[in-house]
């Protein structure tokens, strides 16, 4: 599955090893979500920093924020790229969140259907 959909809009929720700090997923420390982004800017940042522990751009339990304008409204202290900068970097929003799939009982359960269809 990863060979086909990574990098891309697919988040996999997998069993967390003992090495994963429980604070990374306080609601269910037995799992961890992993994603490899497709966009060149994100991959450039990851190439320089290594693995990043992040959250999605929405409040827990609420719909995903799909535009920079929605992010700025919900999180006014967050800096986002201006429209001209997004255009210069080739950032195009699909309008869909990532698909989230959890490995459980020897099969994938779709927790959120998004841009990737499994």
Task: List PLM regions with ranges.
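Active-site-adjacent structural elements in enzyme catalytic cores
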Residues: 1-118
């Amino acid at each position: 599955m990863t060979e086909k959909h990574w990098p891309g809009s697919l988040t996999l929720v997998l069993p967390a090893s003992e090495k994963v700090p429980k604070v990374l997923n306080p609601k269910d420390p037995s799992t961890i979500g992993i994603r490899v982004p497709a966009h060149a800017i994100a991959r450039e940042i990851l190439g320089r920093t290594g693995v990043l522990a992040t959250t999605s751009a929405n409040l827990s339990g609420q719909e995903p924020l799909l535009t920079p304008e929605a992010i700025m409204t919900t999180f006014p202290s967050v800096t986002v790229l201006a429209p001209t900068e997004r255009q210069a970097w080739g950032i195009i929003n699909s309008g869909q969140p990532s698909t989230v799939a959890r490995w459980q009982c020897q099969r994938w359960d779709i927790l959120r259907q998004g841009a990737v269809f499994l």
